[in-house]
Amino acid sequence: TGRPFTGVPLELREFPGMRYALTANGARILDTATGEILIEHLLSKESAKKALEITGKYDTLQEIYFDGQGYAKDEKLAHVERYHKDCNMWEYVRASRIAVPDIWELFNSREENLDKVQALFADMEERKAAWEELSECRDLNLVSSLKYNIEINAAGVNKGKGLIALGK
């Protein structure tokens, strides 16, 4: 899944026989029974900063993910409907992200690398422009599960490679 582990419904996290969770598009793979991180391919702080600077030029709800948890600016999260076009997802997003007053303050206060960055766009032309600019960054891998978002991982990170690595 592209979700962080905390964003996976509890029923699935505790489902009998589901031993592993491939999260954040393959950036983090863990043993659900023990909580042990088996594989990590994290986004460097430098690359994440670049992604945040680019997406921050636009009207976006930016999310950063550390250690399986998503964080978003409180003011933007309060208006998730402006950025997330699927009303069925509004409560999920509000419930699964931790609201913070300043995304940059949190980013700068943490030393570790990130699972991923995500930006939800209010305007699709702005999304297109951001995608083009982000695509020029060779240290980033871009995916989109929705017409209005960009999920940003470290280069080479994706669910397929994560499954192959887990299989080894």
Spans of features found by a protein language model:
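Active-site phosphate-binding/coordination module
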Residues: 2-85
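Conserved acidic, metal-coordinating active-site core of Asp-based
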Residues: 54, 58, 65-168
